[in-house]
UniProtKB/Swiss-Prot annotation:
Keyword Metal-binding: yes
Binding annotation for Mn(2+) 1: 147-148
Entry-linked InterPro entries: PP2C, PP2C_BS, PPM-type-like_dom_sf, PPM-type_phosphatase-like_dom
UniProt source species: Oryza sativa subsp. japonica
Tissue-specificity statement: Highly expressed in mature pollen grains.
Gene name for this UniProt entry: PP2C13
GO biological process terms, semicolon-separated: pollen germination; signal transduction
Listed EC numbers: 3.1.3.16
Official protein name in the record: Probable protein phosphatase 2C member 13, mitochondrial
Stated family: Belongs to the PP2C family.
Length: 363
């Protein structure tokens, strides 16, 4: 997602496009040669002083799904379980970098399964979170896939904080869309502040689904995707945030940024997505403002698939939801989709959450 090799080549174009005077950016202390966070520095001098952007190439730590590390990373069981929700299973692949699990509500109306695989990558930068809770007697379910780039920290931060922040929002039950939008952007700000002294520039996507009563809210930042099956047809509830999307390109250019071809279309010739958490060096062009879709949970809504682009790069929307409708256990669906993506040559981490809606049925 991040092309560091092209960053140095593209930066002069970005600088010329954004200002006619000496460019000055707000940079973390680690990148500004000891200048306090919030101080402006000459970006050209910074580039010379740090031998280009080699300093941003921070080796991501290996994150294997052993029983301890998977649990610590939120990669096993939901952290909160509402009354009436029962765990079905949880498996981890140890050194294989594989984890999966699932649960079902006792009334049989909602089932969830998830699978996460390091795949062909040496490091794991995908995270996911599943939470079930109750607020003022209202059952709430939250599902999220976070695909990191430039390191795992941003995705891990979202797993640890995004839903916790959302559940604390005062308007969560009364204006859920507003709560989601504000929480996404606040969490992004909090992450950037927490990393202000860190010598890295991690970023992450977020594809989330929040079920409150009979309403499903799907929010997206980046190129992870959410797809539902509605009345037998696959329907994407999110649109990938790519720099060559006409509306996204216009937004970036209006903010003073540029979209450059460097193997694919990239913001400033660097990032192959137009919205993300983190990526402080590309703010304000790369934002964490989500696009949100609301769906009524009725008999037409059959299933939901959330996944990172490691799946969607090689699996079509229709194929994913078709499998989700034919299998009884959503964990089995998630595992099969992960295996299909890997067998088709997906070179990325692969993470998938499958939610099945069963209307007027009991187990």
């Amino acid at each position: 997602m991040v092309c560091f090799a092209s960053l140095r080549r593209a930066l002069p174009l970005l600088l010329r496009a954004t200002t006619t005077t000496t460019p000055r950016f707000l940079l973390p202390r680690a990148l500004s040669g000891g200048v306090g966070g919030g101080a402006a520095v000459d970006a050209r001098a910074l580039l010379r002083g740090h031998s280009g952007w080699r300093g941003l190439r921070v080796a991501a730590r290996m994150m294997l799904d052993s029983s301890d590390s998977a649990a610590a990373a939120g990669q096993m069981q939901p952290q909160q379980r509402a009354a009436g929700a029962v765990a079905c299973s949880a498996q981890d692949g140890g050194a294989a970098g594989y984890a999966s699990g699932g649960w079902a509500r006792e009334d049989g109306k909602l089932k969830c399964g998830y699978s996460s695989f390091r795949g062909k990558r040496a490091t794991m930068e995908d995270f996911y979170d599943v939470k079930l809770t109750e607020i003022d007697g209202q059952a709430v379910s939250l599902f999220g896939v976070f695909d990191g780039h430039g390191g795992p920290r941003a995705a891990e931060y979202l797993k640890e904080n995004l839903f916790e922040n959302l559940l604390k929002h005062p308007e969560f039950l009364t204006d859920t869309k507003l709560a989601i939008s504000e929480t996404y952007q606040k969490t992004d700000t909090d992450f950037l502040e927490s990393e202000s002294n860190a010598f890295r520039d991690d970023g992450s996507t977020a594809s989330t689904a929040v079920l409150v009563g009979g309403h499903l809210y799907v929010a997206n930042v980046g190129d992870s995707r959410a797809v539902v099956s509605k009345a037998g047809k696959a329907m994407a509830l999110s649109e990938d945030h790519k720099p060559n999307r006409s509306d996204e390109r216009k937004r970036i250019e209006n903010a003073g940024g540029v979209v450059i071809w460097a193997g694919t279309w990239r913001v400033g010739g660097v990032l192959a997505m137009s919205r993300a958490f983190g990526n402080r060096l590309l703010k304000p062009f790369v934002v964490a403002e989500p696009e949100i879709q609301e769906e009524l949970v009725n008999e037409d809504l059959e299933c939901l698939v959330l996944a990172s682009d490691g799946l969607w790069d090689v699996v079509e929307n229709e194929e994913a939801v078709s499998l989700a409708k034919t299998e009884d256990l959503p964990e089995s669906v998630a595992r099969k989709l992960t295996e299909i993506a890997y067998s088709r040559g997906s070179a990325d981490n692969i993470t998938c959450i499958v939610v099945q809606f069963h209307h007027d049925k009991t187990e």
